[in-house]
Structure formats: C-alpha cells, structure tokens
Amino acid sequence: GPKDTIPPVIVYMNPDNFTTNIDTLHPPKIYVEFNEYVQIKDQQKELYTSPAMKKKPSVVRRGKGIVVTIKDTLRPNTTYAINFGSSIQDNNESNPLHSMRYVFSTGDTVDSMYMSGYTADSYEADSVSKSFIYFFIADSVERPTEWDSTMFKYKPHVIARAEKNGIFIAQNLKPVDYRIYAFEDTNDNMEYEPSIDQIGILDTTYNPSKMP
C-alpha cells in the first residue's frame, strides 16, 4: 500500500488542554492519547517549557499515549506551556506531530495574547532558525544602563522558538509591557552562551494589547 505520511492525531487529554487552577506543589500527571502508537524522539532537544522549569518534565510512552510528569514546583497564577516540538512521531514511518503544545494555568485564567515575529541575522540579512525568544515582564527587571545583564540575572516569563524560516509565534502573553531578547541556540542546549551565540534585543518594550 501507499506509504504512511500522516502524523499522529490527539484523541484524548487528561487533564484537558487549557485546564486552570492546577496545584503548584502537586501538579497532576498529564496523559495524552493518540490514534496510533507513537515514539518519542530527541526529547532533550525538542521539548521545552514556557516559562522554563528547573527540572524538565519527563515524558514516557503508555499504550497509544504518553504520560508527562512535572518535577518542579510551579509559580502561582502563571500560564505554562509544554512545547513538544517534533518529538512525538508515529511508530511506523516517524511522521512527526509538529508544534504540539499542552497549556495549563495555576491561576483562574489562561493568558491568551500572542505576538508573531521574525528573527534575522542583521549582518547577513538572513533568517536565524535555531533561535529562542525570551519575554521578560518589563516591570520585573532592571532597566539596562551601560551593560545589559537581564539574560543572566532573570528568568523569562514566556519563551518561544523560531521555525526554520525564522518566524515565531509567542503565545500565552499577558497584556503588559515586555522586554524581548532573541538568541541563536548554536549548541542546541536551550541556553544562552555569550561566547558563541548571537543575541538581539528589541530596542523598545512590547505590549500585545497595544501593538499588532
């Protein structure tokens, strides 16, 4: 027969996607079921959380699904997203389920604003594909003077990752002012290394409720 080119389809989640009032100290295990058996590929490189957790969630297979265990104490009144990248693939032909996300909140609501953008190399006028975009709530970090140490002193409130064409969509933003940083993740370790990673900084604050 013809080669299977269709990625897995989600058929069930527990708790549901966009669940609110998740316990910060004892978050539940998350079960996601698919219409076929799946494999988990390149989890260390593909999976990330927004905001970052001190310990990455563990993801294991169970039947036709996966079980996600959160190993960190969560922040109160915070919207979290577990981004799986292309790590979830079908068992037979390794067709990836691109950009799968599981979103939940430890508060009463899920932050729902977003920003789309593009990361580019200012010297070569080309897109930067292996890049992460960090959003810091402006009121929570110092205003830089001579030297900007934000990336080393603070943890981002929202994290996005650019596609191969440099385009990114940052989701689950609040209607507040953000300072935005983008860096090229040369070593695929999801950490900014100033000796090898390029970095760019938006020269103004950004508020998704006031700007497109």
Give short role names for the model-derived ranges:
Residues 98-99, 185-212:
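Structured interaction patches on ligand/partner-binding surfaces of diverse proteins
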Residues 1-172, 177-179, 199:
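Acidic, low-complexity Ser/Thr/Gly/Pro-rich repeat segments typical of extracellular/periplasmic
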